[in-house]
Curated annotation (Swiss-Prot):
UniProt-annotated location(s): Cell membrane; Myelin membrane
Covalent lipid adducts (S-palmitoyl cysteine), residues: C6, C7, C10, C109, C141
Natural source organism: Macaca fascicularis (Crab-eating macaque)
GO biological process: axon development; central nervous system myelination
Record field: transmembrane: 11-36, 60-88, 152-178, 239-268
Record family assignment: Belongs to the myelin proteolipid protein family.
SMART domains linked: PLP
InterPro entries in the cross-refs: Myelin_PLP, Myelin_PLP_CS
Residues in the Cytoplasmic compartment per record: 1-10, 89-151, 269-277
Disulfide linkage: C184-C228, C201-C220
This protein's name: Myelin proteolipid protein
Task performed by this protein: This is the major myelin protein from the central nervous system. It plays an important role in the formation or maintenance of the multilamellar structure of myelin.
Membrane topology: Multi-pass membrane protein
């Protein structure tokens, strides 16, 4: 069997659910981390410019924002590696499942790839043997995890629960900014509300962003409307919305990964009891 034909047969048996979930995971994490990082920076500038002139009032908030930004760096790195590992697991276990059902034989493709990788090693001497030994060590390390979907089911389930909390927390700043924007709309169109314009305020202390002794801590009336019209406020609001969408996409990808891994684990457990892959 030629290499092209082998690749075509391997693509037929590709784990499309894992491929879609991986793309969605990378897209969601990139959107959440990138937009979330910039939105936190914009929030810091808005607070120190309009809501408090005393640095001690928002010093704790800045420390929290910087801590979250460092967590974002780690989250992006972790999900990139874990998503790639889940994709590799999807290819491995899907091949094992389809071998049980007889859809295609992975050993044929394996032989073709092996011939391609190891071909011509005799002429390369010790260098070729060293490369083959390195590849064998990588395969040995991955083999401890790949082919064991039960491990990935447990880890992915725990990550899904944790990310569900992250998804819920990402909705909080969207809610705060939406309330502020709604208040600005009421100020811009006084006919829609019976309250006086001067009594319509956005109070950062009410949401726990600033301590209650912060001054002024809130912005009211036409001053608030001027803040809502700034490009900085609009950009930060939309960045938080984008981060929320990214968190939702990542949650969907984790659920897809978990369903696919659970299915593969069930098939291998129930129908492949006497088979080793």
């Amino acid at each position: 069997m030629g290499l092209l034909e082998c690749c075509a047969r391997c693509l037929v048996g590709a784990p499309f659910a894992s491929l879609v979930a991986t793309g969605l995971c990378f897209f969601g994490v990139a959107l959440f981390c990138g937009c979330g990082h910039e939105a936190l920076t914009g929030t810091e500038k808005l607070i120190e410019t309009y809501f408090s002139k005393n640095y001690q009032d928002y010093e704790y908030l800045i420390n929290v924002i910087h801590a979250f930004q460092y967590v974002i760096y780690g989250t992006a790195s972790f999900f990139f590696l874990y998503g790639a590992l889940l994709l590799a697991e999807g290819f491995y276990t899907t091949g094992a499942v389809r071998q049980i059902f007889g859809d295609y034989k992975t050993t044929i493709c394996g032989k073709g790839l092996s011939a391609t990788v190891t071909g011509g090693q005799k002429g390369r001497g010790s260098r070729g043997q060293h490369q083959a030994h390195s590849l064998e060590r990588v395969r040995h390390c991955l083999g401890k995890w790949l082919g064991h979907p039960d491990k990935f089911v447990g880890i992915t389930y725990a990550l899904t629960v944790v990310w569900l909390l992250v998804f819920a927390c990402s909705a909080v700043p969207v809610y705060i900014y939406f309330n502020t924007w709604t208040t600005c709309q009421s100020i811009a169109f006084p006919s829609k509300t019976s309250a006086s314009i001067g009594s319509l305020c956005a109070d950062a202390r009410m949401y726990g962003v600033l301590p209650w002794n912060a001054f002024p801590g809130k912005v009211c009336g036409s001053n608030l409307l001027s803040i809502c019209k700034t490009a900085e406020f609009q950009m930060t609001f939309h960045l938080f919305i984008a981060a929320f969408v990214g968190a939702a996409a990542t949650l969907i990808s984790l659920l897809t990964f978990m369903i696919a891994a659970t299915y593969n684990f069930a098939v291998l457990k129930l129908m492949g009891r006497g088979t080793k892959f």
